[in-house]
Regions:
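Conserved N-terminal beta1-alpha1 strand-loop-helix module at the mouth
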Residues: 1-106, 113-115, 138, 147-175, ...
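A short alpha/beta connector and helix-capping loop motif
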Residues: 117-135, 141, 147
Length: 350
């Protein structure tokens, strides 16, 4: 049994024994209307005490105090882990955060399974709910998205691979999270979300989840087409990181969006792995490669290009990138050579 399966099975047992609120007393009346979740700049800061992959992070963390640290540094959306056994959270944490800071948009992050989970989340004060596509059927996912919206909450649908994209297409959620952490092994591959992002062929705001440790990671995510990030352990340990991440998704980081090098690079790698790429509303048609199987072919870069003819031949032979040397060298390229080969589909690196 995988870690994810253990967590879900434990949650089912708690629901059977204590109900969907898992013993937490819910407010008699919701005190604040739902706040828009993940508004730009979408830096979502997480509140968690531990995790299966990292163990103890901040065991004595006070949820409301941590939310205040994020809020003072400019964050307007927070994620509260309410899973007790593996992450050390509870619905009480979410209630405390929303009561202290009703203006914050709060995501309930848990392994939610049915409509009663959605209704309990709303009653506790959540403005958004995380729905993990791999735990649900396509029909269940669509139904839970609809229930969340009926209550005024934003569903954040979390995807982990091409199969999840296919499953989510029917619901076509407005807010999609792509997780760099494999929920079977809990290992992180920061390039993986950038390979999945091109498969989203409906109008959605995409959030990069897990593995964010600094501004460079956030700029990478923005360059790959993501509108925001969800950051957990790094923010818990260093709340000052919040301002750096907000900067990456503000005007100072706009260049990353305008020069989507990383998005294009990992889209090519996704194609090599057999991932279907974006189609004009007609779906993708196949699922291809899946995580855990060996990559059929690596990315190839040919360096030291000195002529347009060489660049064209490199592309014809399968190069994904061509490189130009502009420092003093026998292979120094003319300054205008990249412009001469701009119509080649391979990426250019100087």
């Amino acid at each position: 049994m995988s870690i994810r399966e253990e967590i879900v099975e434990a949650r089912r047992r708690r629901i059977a024994g204590r109900g969907h609120a898992e013993g937490t007393s819910l407010p008699a009346k919701r005190r604040a209307p739902c706040a828009p979740f993940a508004a730009d700049p979408a830096v979502i800061c997480e509140i968690k005490r531990r995790s299966p992959s990292r163990g103890a992070i901040e065991p004595g963390l006070d949820a409301a105090e941590q939310a205040g640290k994020y809020r003072r540094r400019g964050a307007r959306s927070v994620s509260v882990l309410t899973e007790p056994d593996y992450f050390g959270g509870s619905l009480g944490d979410l209630i405390a955060v929303k009561e202290r800071y009703p203006d914050l948009a709060v995501l309930r992050k848990d392994f939610l399974l049915d409509k009663e989970d959605i209704r309990v989340s709303w009653a506790a004060g959540a403005d958004a709910v995380l729905l993990i596509a791999s735990l649900l059927s396509s029909e269940e996912l669509e139904s839970l998205c609809r229930e969340a919206k009926r209550l005024g909450m934003d569903p954040l649908v979390e995807l982990h691979g091409p199969e999840d994209v296919e499953k989510a297409r029917r619901a076509a959620p407005d807010l999609v999270g792509i997780n760099s952490r494999n929920l079977e092994t809990f290992e992180v591959d920061k390039g993986y979300p950038a390979m999945i992002r091109p498969l989203i062929d409906w109008d959605a705001r995409c959030i990069f989840e897990s593995g964010i440790t600094g501004r460079e990671d956030a700029l990478f995510a923005r360059s790959a087409g993501f509108r925001g990030v969800l950051v957990g352990e790094a923010a818990v340990r260093n709340p000052d990181l919040v301002s750096e991440l907000l900067s990456a998704f503000g005007p100072e980081g706009r260049w990353a969006e305008e020069r989507p090098f990383w998005g294009r690079l990992f889209a090519r790698l996704g194609e090599k792995r057999g991932f279907p790429q974006e189609t004009a509303g007609g779906g993708t048609g196949r699922l291809g490669w899946s995580a855990g199987r060996p990559c059929p072919a690596p990315l190839v870069k040919v360096c030291g290009i000195t002529s347009a003819e060489d660049a064209a031949q490199a592309e014809e032979l399968g190069a994904d990138l061509v490189g130009f040397i502009f420092a003093d060298s026998p292979r120094r390229a003319k300054p205008d050579l990249p412009r001469e080969v701009k119509n080649l589909s391979c990426l250019k690196v100087g």
